[in-house]
Amino acid sequence: MFKKIATFGLSLSLAAGVLAGCGSSADETGSDASKGYEPKELTVQFVPSQSAATLEAKAKPLEELLSDELGIPVKVSVSTNYNTIIEAMASKQVDVGFLPPTAYVLAKEKGAADVILQAQRKGVNDDGSEKDELVDFYKSIFVVKNDSGIDSVADLKDKKIAFQDVTSSAGYVWPAATLMDNDLDPIKDVQGTTVKGHDQAIISLLNGDVDAAAVFQDARNIVKADYPTVFEDTKVVSFTEEIPNDTVSVRSDMTDDWKKKLQDAFIAIGKSDEGHEIIRDIYTHEGYVVSDDSNFDVVREYAEKVKTE
């Protein structure tokens, strides 16, 4: 059974339902309800794909760049988990959220967010090295130790697996679907444990706390500096299907003019040398392109597939 948190026993629809009480209680400073929301100070929040303190330190330089582009103050922070950023957007506490696909879909269903941009990343080879080409998708992988005796998804039965939050696309949803495709129930047939950050999943594996880690491809790179032999000590036993890249999403009541301003600002930052270095360091993003909600229909299909009772 899953340990640490009960949300692994919840369906994604229930995860969304938990947010149902999040009303628009915040002060609508800087907006006219009849015209839509126009921020006087922009609040931007990230989800913790790695240590929250590390991620916030990497993201803080974005404040000045965005402020210069938009002409207003900008505040950047990191949420405690995937659900809290959705809650914050639903309650009008956060204007812009860097949401992974499943979290975006949940936020959209709540009426809390609209997608404006999608990240571009460099493709990743099976050995973890980067490709030169930019892609609009990524994959999740199951990583195990070389000497584990685990050679396939089927071998994960009854094994302890490090997952991310239930709304994490690469850290839970796609891996859970892969387990199901191999006749394994992600709740009953494996021992799931939740960790905060894909780096922590790999570290837990290396420390022997878990038998496998479900992470984005290839999260081993983010711990390589501290664990130089991580690639030699581990192997990938399965790759998931493609996952749409992360979103830049905004609160749903924002005016179209401000949505366009933010699109232009993030695209410009991604093209600048300083900005590119920052966004690459945060989430391995290489730049941004305008996106549409229909790009995430496949995410809805996967979310429906992995619902549990």
Language-model region placement:
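Bilobed "Venus flytrap"/periplasmic-binding protein-like clamshell domains
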Residues: 47-68, 79, 120-121, 136-202
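Acidic, polar ligand-binding/catalytic clefts
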Residues: 87-90, 94-155
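Bacterial signal peptide processing site
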Residues: 23-26
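C-terminal motif of bacterial Sec signal peptides marking the signal peptidase cleavage site
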Residues: 17-21
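A ligand-binding cleft/hinge motif common to bilobed small-molecule-binding domains
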Residues: 101-112, 178-181, 206, 211-231
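Short beta-strand->loop
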Residues: 113-135, 190-191, 224-242
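An extracytoplasmic/periplasmic, membrane-proximal ligand-sensing/linker region
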Residues: 36-46, 50-70, 250, 254-309
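Short beta-strand-to-loop elements that line the ligand-binding cleft
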Residues: 73-80, 95-98, 188-197, 235-238
